[in-house]
Amino acid sequence: MTEAEDFAQLLQKLQNASPALPEGTSSTPTPSSSTGLLPNGKKTKGRVKIKMEYINNKLRRYTTFSKRKTGIMKKAFELSTLTGTQVMLLVASETGHVYTYATPKLQPMISSDTGKAMIQSCLNAPGGDGSDVQPSRTEFTFDSGNGGNGMRKRKMLSDVMSAESSNNSPSMPNFTPFLAPSMAPLFSTFGEDDYNNDESGDDSDSEEASSDIKEEYQGSPTMVKQETTEIDSVTASLQQRIKEAMRQAASNKQAIKKAKITPPSSNMNNAAFLNPFLLQGGANASNLLATAARKGDDAGSLTSNPFLSMGLNLQQLIESAAIASNE
């Protein structure tokens, strides 16, 4: 048996040993149900091709601008560093901020007051409201010579490319001008320290999770702190109102208890029970006893024996008992 036959048999054994996928299944990686992560350890698929159109969602547009602006600045830095090329890059955001990168020879064009005024006048110029946003590509060649002013400008393919792009390719979507006429731009320069910053964004076409976008656009810490303070103040005021209401309810309850009329004494109840058995003479005797008590005559006996203070007719009681026994 030759080596080729041995290799063929080994390959056949490997094919038979590998389990076949059931019908309706694919080898495309799917997120794990328990962790929600793809086999690459991330929640997204990574680099995907996105559609070249204006992003209407403000949060996604802000995130895309931040990543791609930093990415293009890094590319300009790499181009100038690796090839020794003189590079000048300017990016104007929709909030009126201008980000620039320039090599030393071109730095005066963006750092001087004249250059900044020129940039501001160009950005604040009328037009560019979305009717014609096709970029123009122009190439210049500067030759040092003795003739003329020592400079020869050569425009290459700009008109041809503009005509072809307007006739054949679909037009790019409209967008709002970045700067209003009254808005003064703020300049930020990109340097080597920014390039070495690992936390800066990239220009990858990544599929972004909505939760990540919301976390990036939650607002400034000052606004969050103000909202927390307002919530705390409202809670404190509600607690104070509840305490005052409970205190008022307790005081009202106490006042009601004090204002209640005390129930009549047992002596008065007994007198009311015996009123049918009382005669006019007994009532007069009761009045006499009460008058004597006020004058101090035998006051102790009246207070110690409650029956002496009642207008009791003993004869009527005896007659009533006799009638009841006869019946």
From Swiss-Prot:
Which tissues does it occur in? Expressed in muscle, varying with age, decreasing twofold during the first week of adulthood.
| Molecular function (Gene Ontology), one example | DNA-binding transcription factor activity, RNA polymerase II-specific
Region annotated Disordered sits at 12-43, 189-225
Q: What does the record say about the knockout?
A: Mutants usually hatch and appear normal in early L1, but become progressively paralyzed later during L1. Complete larval lethal, typically at late L1 or early L2. Abnormal bodywall and egg-laying muscle in hermaphrodites, but with no obvious abnormality of pharyngeal muscle or other cell types. Five percent of the progeny from hlh-1, unc-120 double heterozygous parents exhibit partial absence of bodywall muscle and reduced expression of myosin myo-3.
Per UniProt, residues of the MADS-box domain are 45-105
Give residue spans, biased composition: Acidic residues.
191-210
Keyword annotations for this protein? Developmental protein, DNA-binding, Myogenesis, Nucleus, Transcription, Transcription regulation
Look up the record and give one Gene Ontology term from the biological process aspect.
Answer: positive regulation of transcription by RNA polymerase II
Asked whether the keyword Magnesium is assigned, the reply is no
Protein role: Transcription factor. Regulates myogenesis, in cooperation with transcription factors hlh-1 and hnd-1. Required for maintenance of muscle in adulthood.
Protein name in the entry:
Serum response factor homolog
